Amino acid sequence: MERLIDCVILPAGPGDADDLARVHIRAWRETYAGLLPDGYLAAMNPKMYARRWRLQLTRARAGEVVLAAEGRDGMVGYCAGAVAGEDAEIFTLYLLKTAQHAGLGLRLFASAARVLAAVGAKRLKLWVLNGNRPARAFYVRNGGRAGAERPVRGWGGELLETAYRWDDVGTLSERH
């Protein structure tokens, strides 16, 4: 397990695309095994994901944030989100299994919330697949309130996801 003190959180840029793709794919395979089809997870292509990340980071607009958690051996997690007016949304928060349960997830999440609050966000939301029980428990432990559910199509079927909300992003940004 990566020690929290050994990790730094930094803004990600286009030069981090390969590492983001590596962490993205590995974290999805670790997180969604048994929830998403094995064939989909096995077919995730590092070059394609690196291109997507590079393009996203090259075209980043004001109010968008991508933070990376870097450990001794490289990137171990990331968080991405954006603000629109007073509302912010976290699109992704993933840590490799080896970096979980050490406080780094909260540190990364709270860091993104601080960045979003600094550019005007008052409220925050995110969506989580209902089958991702560890993530749902993490968000509840950290003040998120479950809200609406919606179907999401993809991966060969339809799954449900639940919204989690924080009415005051400042309370989340102060958690770590």
Predicted stretch roles:
Residues 27-29, 135-140:
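K/E-rich alpha-helical interaction surfaces of small helical-bundle regulatory domains
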Residues 2-7, 11-17, 22-35, 39-100, ...:
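Acetyl-CoA-dependent GNAT
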Residues 64, 159-163:
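Short hydrophobic/aromatic beta-strand or adjacent loop that forms the aromatic wall/cage
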Residues 117-127:
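Conserved GNAT acetyl-CoA-binding A-motif
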Residues 126-135, 153-157:
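Conserved beta-strand-loop-alpha-helix junction that forms the acyl-donor binding cleft
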Residues 140-148:
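Conserved acetyl-CoA-binding loop of GNAT-fold acetyltransferases
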Residues 172-174:
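Acidic/histidine-enriched, glycine/proline-rich intrinsically disordered or flexible terminal extensions
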